[in-house]
Amino acid sequence: MLTEKDYCDYETCVALKELGYNEKSNWWFSKYLNEDSGQMELVHICDNPAHLNYDSWGIVPKDFVIRPSLYEAQKWLREEKGIIVGIINNFTTHEFDFYVSTWEEDICRGNKYSSYEDALQRGIKESVKILKEKKDE
């Protein structure tokens, strides 16, 4: 069963959206006005596939941010952007390391994460950061 740690966090989802991530999903982030506090709050929405998640043209509502699983984001980065995020376990420390690469070069690495999901989340964040920097050049 998937848990909260199996999905990208809000900041990563916003960055993925800016990079063009627009895959169909039943998981979203959206903001709503909390009438008690008068503040905008972030909510995580799960919808039934039978319900309308997209408008009649298949477009995500502008104020929604798609929330992919870590695997969905990892796969999209690999297939659409040519960025590979991999996880390696460290047998001596029982921790996980990530690496980010293309088919031609190793871009960056990170280590000492207590869970596979934490390492993958960080690797995806680093990938998105690198892609955004290249986009801004």
Explain the meaning of each model-derived region.
Residues T12-L19, E72-K75, L120-E126:
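Short, hydrophobic/amphipathic alpha-helical patches that form generic packing surfaces
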Residues R109-E137:
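Ampiphathic alpha-helical segments that act as solvent-exposed interaction surfaces
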